[in-house]
Amino acid sequence: MTVDAPNRKQTIGIPTAILFMCGQNSIRSPMAEAIAKSLLQPDIYIQSAGVRSGEPDPFVDVVLEEVGLSLNHRRPHRPRTLEEIEDDFFDLIVTLAPEAHHVALELTRSSAVDVVYWPTMDPTVVTGTREQMLDAYRQVRDHLWKLIDKRMKPIRRPPPASG
């Protein structure tokens, strides 16, 4: 995959194409993609990918459904790698795991693409009851929600009209 930056809006620093990356595209990056698609303007192109392709994680569906979101909005989510992304023109890559950050920096070293690292815990390291494990996934969801909401305010969807 080559990662090139488009010229659309880039001069004013507002991303028009965002890629979220993690290790396997099964938890953190698809969760961030779903949240971003719900919070950001619909004309922002948003995708997610992993360094490797993992397996879908049902806990992600559970914690997203709790807030009215779904990975399966238009088609079932299938974890994918960078090579499987159809459109590779991103002007912002948000990495959520150290390995993904290193890969993104390597891929973009000769491109005008902004790469930012948002350290995000891997909820699969938490053991215990089902509820304890779900709490770890909720923490990741809420962490990503706050980061996207705070750091991408200029491209947020306008609030619904009241009345």
Go through each PLM region and give its residues.
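Short polar/charged helix/loop
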Residues: 2-163
